Amino acid sequence: LMASNAYYNDALEKAGVRDLSGAIESLKISLRFNKLNIDARNLLGLIYYEMGEVVTALTEWVISKNYQPKDNLASRYLDEVQKNQVRLDSVNQTIKKYNQALLYCKQNSRDLAIIQLKKVLSLNPKLVSGHQLLALLYIQEGRYDLAKKSLRNAGKIDANNTVTLRYLKEANAA
């Protein structure tokens, strides 16, 4: 239990300086030590939500609520998301458009993928993975300034994301 709480506290510190990826790792370790650490699970959901990963956030909150049905902040988080139909519709559109962008990437249609990702990010501007994929496509196209802009946007959400930092290093080296 002490180890779980220590990793939870570490995650709080990391989240406080927008190291969301680092906070996620600490929270996952915390939950390995104690899967019933409701505060850790709820914070993990909040961080996923902040990173635009709404479905993953909802999953964590549902698990949390199953472990502790009463007096659980997850109930409030779930209610707030579920009663906002516009937000739920936006999440569904984001998922569809992001998956379409991935399909375009697999088909080597980078221009269509870029257009689709711009739509995704207009619906969900905090989707770190969307900014990263857009930047990767820009790097492949040799459009390094646009890649850096997209990566800076991702960095504002999650300051120490290793994928973002690796892509930024690549874009700066070009």
Model-identified regions with their sequence ranges:
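TPR-adjacent "capping" and linker segments in tetratricopeptide-repeat scaffold/adaptor proteins
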Residues: 1-6, 81-96
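Helix-start (N-cap) detector for alpha-helical repeat units in TPR-like alpha-solenoids
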Residues: 4-5, 38-39, 72-73, 94, ...
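Register position in tetratricopeptide repeats
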Residues: 16-17, 50, 67, 80-87, ...
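Conserved structural position within tetratricopeptide repeats
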Residues: 28-32, 63-66, 121-122, 153-156, ...
